[in-house]
Amino acid sequence: MDIYYKKDNCTLALGDTFEVIEKIKSESIDMIFADPPYFLSNDGFSNSGGKVVSVNKGDWDKISSFEEKHNFNREWIRKAKRVLKPNGTIWISGTLHNIYSVGMALEQEGFKILNNITWQKTNPAPNLSCRYFTHSTETILWARKADKYARHYYNYDLMKEINNGKQMKDVWTGPLTKISEKWAGKHPTQKPEYLLERIILASTEKGGYVLDPFVGSGTTGVVAKRLGRKFVGIDFKEEYLDIAKRRLEVVINNEKETK
């Protein structure tokens, strides 16, 4: 494992997630957020800024068979389970291309799925083929270890408070990532900060440890740090870790200026 960046309880590790997770202490993580490969890179096309573009994100997003995809998901979820605290939870984001494998893998590896969150995007990319409905949602599975004595943390009162005094439902509506959040560089699947803010507030307390095994541009870390959580992020692409590092530096420097 190569520590790419470490500062103020924020760590970015460069390497293969399967190998790096092995270095993390057992039952030390309060919450995991993962946005694993969607396996969309099949030489198809999408829309970006009104232009037709390839959906190929790189070799990391390609796979040859369902078995390979499912084995991949089972392996990283199995390793993630070891580092999760007994009362910890895991959130996994995906689309129809991978989420069914993820859900099955969670149950096969000893997790209980708590919620099936639907993130409804208010400004999705248009459907260029006109052969099916526009893809405007992503699914986020929330799960805990399937131990009947486990009592996962959920900040019910806060979720109700930020939802105008009503119980928070499992359909969350909002826009794609703002341009202002992409200033540090490009990443094909960068999540909006408001999404991670809700997830982290719902399932962790201040001072808790958050892990993102596919950290990408670092949104999970940026929000975790801003909310007073400790953070570990892993990625095998140095160019993405550089984006995450630059974003984390801004949050850390802003905190120092306000003290």
Model-derived segments and their meaning:
Residues M1-D242:
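Core catalytic lobe of class I
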